[in-house]
Amino acid sequence: MKVESRENQPSAASADRSGADQESGAAERPDPSKKTDDGKPHAPAENGQKPPSNAKDPSRPRRKKARRACFACQRAHLTCGDERPCQRCIKRGLQDACTDGVRKKAKYLHDAPDGALMPGVGGNFYSSNNNNSSMRNNLPLSRNGANAVNANAQQNTGANFYPTPQSTSYNVYQENPINQSSFTSQSPVSPTFNLKTNPTARTNSLSSVGQQPPTTTGVSGPNPQNPFAGALFDPSDPALFNFDLSSMNFENRYGALEFGMLGHMATGAGDSPSDSATQRGSMGRSGSAQFSNTPITGQPGFGESPGGQQPFMFGDPLLNEWPGGQASGQAHVNVGGVYPQSGQGSVIPGHLSKTDAPHAFTIESGPNFASPSATTSPQMTSGFDDHALNNAVAKSNGMANGQRPTISTPSLKHQSLQIGAKRRPRNPSSIYESVKEPYAYTNRFHNLTACIQRRFSPQKTLQIAKALASIRPSFIATTKTLNRDDLIFMEKCFQRTLWEYEDFINACGTPTIVCRRTGEIAAVGKEFSILTGWKKDVLLGKEPNLNVNTGGSSLPGSGTTSRSFTPRGSVGESTAPGRPQPVFLAELLDDDSVVEFYEDFARLAFGDSRGSVMTTCKLLKYKTKEDMELAQSDDNQRWNNHLRKGGIASEAGMNQLGFKDGKVECAYCWTVKRDVFDIPMLIVMNFLPCI
């Protein structure tokens, strides 16, 4: 009995091992040619079973690690292979159900489709399940029985369609102009891309029957056999966006695609006429992408560029050239046939109605790229499109009607397209090339002294002189070691800093001025001119200063009778009134405000480098002799009419502040900026009127 039990043990053990192999596939059968640890070949067991292999044997064949296990091996936590079906599923008889297992996605990928994360799938994720040619050929696409799918005349034409997330129906648009349209749903915001289709899909694309009038057909219903029921583009296909994933420092493919899609949407947000994104099918202002077919080849494409030209996203040279081209008379041809000519009675194929679309603004663009309003019609032309060029291109492309619609944006006026030419150059290198001489601060300080003596009384002139005398030794100490090159460099620093501040002044809605340390106005904002009536050219010395408003506390020339002072300057440099020269800050404030300013300036000039002063003042309005006579004649009547019409609610109302006495009471804050030599370089002042 014991002998029989021993003989039965190997068979039972082998049966258990065979069952384990069938269930888990963990055990392996060694090669008979391989040797054991003692150098002897494996000998078959008495019952015909091979002995198990030694896992520590260095000559044991190593199994290649699979990129992704199948579902069965993943569930059993077993080693799988790259082939499908894998060897373990074949042994277990599960070769028909051997598919790649689904990995647990990260939190930021929870909304990503499973197929988009599978390696090697690419753009075939959606198209592989929706490219049944027999279904497309037999699919009726007719709303009222007028249109059907013609499989014989479909080789060079494509279909334009839109996904609508609100319902399960899709609008399919034919290539011919559509006479009537009924768009009831709004498409989601989608980026621009090329719709890659295989030859089977291109051969079986949609077209309208030549004898039937072109109408809008619809494909509806969540039919699983509907080839359009799936998604219309694959976000995991990098060819759709034409950017290299390997060049992006992303460990995840889907994250790189998401980053590229956001950049692609940002570059296509400006709905400009000749923008290459528009030619490829730019984002519509109603939040939907514009599908179009190339008239050159007739092949389907999502806004493909002409002549098989590959679209591009980053470094697009056409993104910023269209304002200059339009202003110079160059016409930009509509590549995808997006906008039809006005008067043809047709609507835009593949474009939804804009009546329900919100207003949009172009991202990171100037006023030249202002987005059109939702009520404007894209069929209208701006009046400066070159139709002759459009006709010539249309004839060269073999179009029957000989007309090519042009992309036009009616809300962009022709005058606004020429604004860019008047803007200053964005390259500050011209500053370093133009400054050749140091600024004559000595002469300017003498001019300031003469201006103060002409306007203020001797008592207030003495107060200002004491304040300036307190900082005079500091100026001498900081400038005595500077040579001519240092002074030229100082002026370059000033001009470069002023060049930077001009952008801030234009972007800020607060009345702002920038002065030199002498008090001369160097930059001024539009709001300050509106508030005080001082024109920018007058403040900068480009036009004569004809102001006679000095606040009324002292008469002009009252300070010049007490002493005979002749300012030092070059020949012909006169301080006579009316000579075009920059206006001093002392001419913009009333007497008390000027004295208070210079007392604060004496404490702040060489004191706290980051300090500022916040106080109140009274600005003097710009008034000529004619303005003073007019104000005295109908002062009360104009002021009462102004208050009756709504106060200071508009630009004209702000200009009327201080109309009665010629002074505008303001609260202002100012600070001193120093240069590299720690010398006061400029004074930045912000004003707010006290209402």
From Swiss-Prot:
GO terms for molecular function: DNA-binding transcription factor activity, RNA polymerase II-specific; RNA polymerase II transcription regulatory region sequence-specific DNA binding; zinc ion binding. Residues 1-63, 179-228, 269-310, 549-579 are annotated as: Disordered. This is Transcription activator of gluconeogenesis acuK. One of its GO terms (biological process) is positive regulation of metabolic process. Its main location: nucleus. The gene is acuK. SUPFAM superfamilies: Zn2/Cys6 DNA-binding domain (SSF57701). It holds the Pfam family PAS_13. InterPro entries: ERT1_acuK_gluconeogen_tf, PAS_13, Zn2-C6_fun-type_DNA-bd_sf, Zn2Cys6_DnaBD. Residues 179-223, 273-297 have a biased composition (Polar residues). The lineage of its organism: Eukaryota, Fungi, Dikarya, Ascomycota, Pezizomycotina. Residues 70-98 bind DNA. It is found in: Nucleus. Keywords: Activator, DNA-binding, Gluconeogenesis, Metal-binding, Nucleus, Transcription, Transcription regulation, Zinc. Residues 26-43 have a biased composition (Basic and acidic residues). Transcription factor which regulates nonfermentable carbon utilization. Activator of gluconeogenetic genes.
